[in-house]
């Protein structure tokens, strides 16, 4: 992967770790940082050797505090224009609806506005006990336009979501867990170990099965009738799984009492 200035990308076997690297400004994002993150997730999506991703923030204070409002204000004063997010959305992830590989958000501090929207776009959200979440855009004359309004209202009860969004209030990691948008809360020092543990458990499964599962779940959310959703399994990732080497290897390894050797094809 190309060298980056505002993010760090590490590869550990089948695992990609993406770190937002602007701790001096609470990992807020401007167009250049957004583009770097988008490039990283483009590579993740395209690389058949990468099966799971973790996204986190540098430092101990912030996962991502959203847009770099100082940059936005300066640009608008100079040009009259607002910065645009990349086509795949804030952080290169918020509008990436075609990504069938799993993403884990390891939230190490504040996740505000667009930062919270990145975390909501992940499949699993592991939070440090120091993490805090909010969609505070109405407090500065904006709205959570990178998927926060739509995702939060789908991931937790509507009245609780509205209570957060209409006030812009901050929510602790523990309350986020109780509401249901946080998968697990751990002591701050254990955050990355916990995220790696979850990634390791996913990597024990067939990547073909994981992609099929994610694709069916996410696309079925748009089907109002359960019976119709259950009948419709003609999704590309599900069909690919049924025709894969992995679907033969899994039962064979089970019968032979050994770990399966997944090929991802």
Give the ranges of each region predicted by the language model.
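Crotonase-fold acyl-CoA enzyme core
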Residues: 94-208, 243-244, 248-252, 258
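An acidic, glycine-rich surface segment that forms the CoA-thioester-binding/catalytic face
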Residues: 35-42, 69-108, 140, 155, ...
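Terminal peptide-recognition signature
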Residues: 18, 22, 36-37, 55, ...
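A short, glycine- and basic residue-enriched loop/turn
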Residues: 23-26, 60-61, 66, 130-132, ...
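C-terminal alpha-helix plus adjacent terminal tail
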Residues: 1-16, 48, 60, 71, ...
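Conserved CoA-thioester-binding segment of acyl-CoA-metabolizing enzymes
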Residues: 1-60
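Short glycine-rich anion-binding loops that position phosphate/pyrophosphate groups of nucleotides
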Residues: 59-61, 109-110
């Amino acid at each position: 992967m190309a060298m980056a200035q505002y993010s760090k990308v590490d590869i550990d076997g089948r695992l990609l770790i993406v770190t937002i690297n602007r701790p001096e400004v609470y990992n807020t994002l401007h167009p250049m940082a957004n583009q770097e993150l988008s490039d990283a997730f483009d590579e993740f999506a395209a690389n058949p050797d990468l099966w799971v991703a973790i996204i986190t923030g540098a430092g101990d204070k912030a996962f991502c505090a959203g847009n770099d409002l100082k940059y936005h204000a300066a640009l608008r004063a100079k040009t009259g224009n607002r910065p645009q997010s990349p086509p795949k959305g804030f952080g290169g992830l918020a509008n990436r609806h075609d990504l069938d590989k799993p993403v884990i958000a390891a939230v190490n501090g504040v996740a505000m506005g667009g930062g919270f929207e990145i975390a909501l776009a992940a499949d699993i959200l592991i939070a440090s006990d120091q993490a805090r979440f909010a969609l505070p855009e109405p407090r500065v004359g904006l709205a959570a336009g990178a998927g926060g309004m739509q995702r939060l209202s789908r991931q937790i009860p509507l009245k609780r979501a509205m209570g957060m969004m209409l006030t812009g209030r901050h929510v602790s990691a523990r309350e986020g867990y109780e509401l249901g948008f946080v998968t697990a809360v751990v002591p701050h020092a254990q955050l990355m170990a916990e995220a790696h543990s979850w990634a390791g458990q996913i990597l024990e499964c067939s990547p073909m099965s994981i992609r099929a599962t994610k694709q069916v779940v996410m696309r079925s959310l748009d089907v109002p009738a359960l019976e119709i959703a259950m009948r419709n399994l003609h999704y590309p990732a599900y069909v690919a799984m049924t025709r894969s080497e992995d679907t033969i290897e899994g039962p064979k390894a089970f019968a032979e009492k050994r770990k399966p050797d997944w090929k991802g094809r």
